[in-house]
Amino acid sequence: MSELTALTIAEARDKLKAKAITATELTDAYLSAIDAANDAINAYVAVTHDQARSMAKASDERIAKGEAGALEGIPLGVKDLFATKGVHTQACSHILDGFKPEYESTVTANLWADGAVMLGKLNMDEFAMGSSNETSYYGPVKNPWRAKGSNADLVPGGSSGGSAAAVAAHLCAGATATDTGGSIRQPAAFTGTVGIKPTYGRVSRWGTVAFASSLDQAGPIARDVRDAAILMKSMASLDLKDTTSVDLPVPDYEAALGRSVKGMKIGIPREYRVDGMPGEIEELWQKGIQYLKDAGAEIVDISLPHTKYALPAYYIVAPAEASSNLARYDGVRYGLRVPGKDIADMYEQTRAAGFGKEVKRRIMIGTYVLSAGYYDAYYLRAQKVRTLIKKDFEDVFAKGVDAILTPATPSAAFGLADEVLANDPVKMYLNDIFTVTVNMAGLPGIAVPAGLNGQGLPLGLQLIGRPFEEETLFQAAHVIEQAAGRFTPAKWW
């Protein structure tokens, strides 16, 4: 069975088309793998066995009739942030206990319309707030990777930790994820997988539980660049239900792979060389530069002067939007309800019991920076910084730069329940240092595995592109992948 789960989406698609395997066989192989591994890895918070089998059966019937969709019979995992009709959707929070939506998110509806099969809902940081998947009400996810000669559990990154871990451990062929400040790219880098955050507005947010609405963007996590391109094509669409959705044709991203990068201008930002960055990250970056240079790309030094203000500005804008978005959870119509002596008390008791520590922290920060006395000092100033960050990128792209190459994370995956990080939220927030600028500017960014560190753990590089030019990112990421190879964890679970 494991040879079926080892297939990439592209390989499985070809075998299904050739009728060498059936969608039912493929789905059963994944369900068996999940049942065997999930107690150890905790990637899934709900497994939809019956629904998966009936979707696979319908796929087999369509294949037999010659009516196969672009993702026909491909088993996928769905981050618990996406509404799935009649299926557990709780953003991994206690406050949404028992919530099963009456509607389907646009992203998942697009995937099912193309014939994909749903295996279940994936673990994540509560309301997508976290960088280690330790804030989930359902407990942490364990990274399928371990350091050489060690049995210590590592985090898979966050907030899409379940998505990244499930893809790396072959518990789904690919997964949906979301990225508000790095939540697709950082877990992808920590697990040796590929993750792309599309341009803001490229993929619909409708039916995705909101964290910070001006920053949130859905995208795929997959085993390789080709699979990410295949998934992205199905996920992206114009959606009139999302006012930020952009009416642009969705290109065939897969067709961009293998195109030469000769003459492509790749920018290397000097501000991304941060103090205390491990030497292995700098080495990896140099390696990535060399891979692109060898393939004919032109490397240029660039400056993004406002980079150092991105993280503090992000941690004002994102919590401000979160405090507003999360005001809707009150225990009245759905989810958890804790009784109180009157309605105001019921609200307070429900929110006190329903939200976890990190979510409460961000709601309080957000409410504070939006309060009358501090709005100008914090929120307004952060929005001005955001405009300057966006302008930095615009200036660089105006000079003819096609894409920017940076590290994806400041380190490899760290230990589960790390006491230093648990006691210092700011240290945890520093995980997003290379990724938040991309969300602040609304640009596309892809994380691609580029090597292993001294302990045998995966490290990723990030490519940042011009708005709506994801094809360029797939093209350049494919070059890095071809040079670096693919990375799979040794099975311990």
From Swiss-Prot:
PANTHER family: GLUTAMYL-TRNA(GLN) AMIDOTRANSFERASE SUBUNIT A, TRANSAMIDASE. The active site is at 79 (charge relay system), 159 (charge relay system), 183 (acyl-ester intermediate). GO terms for cellular component: glutamyl-tRNA(Gln) amidotransferase complex. The keyword rRNA-binding does not apply. Belongs to the amidase family. GatA subfamily. PROSITE patterns: AMIDASES (PS00571). Signal peptide: none annotated. The gene is gatA. This is Glutamyl-tRNA(Gln) amidotransferase subunit A. SUPFAM superfamilies: Amidase signature (AS) enzymes (SSF75304). Gene3D superfamilies: Amidase signature (AS) domain. It is an enzyme of class 6 (ligase). InterPro entries: Amidase, Amidase_CS, Amidase_dom, AS_sf, GatA. The keyword Nucleotide-binding applies. It catalyses: L-glutamyl-tRNA(Gln) + L-glutamine + ATP + H2O = L-glutaminyl-tRNA(Gln) + L-glutamate + ADP + phosphate + H(+). Keywords: ATP-binding, Ligase, Nucleotide-binding, Protein biosynthesis.
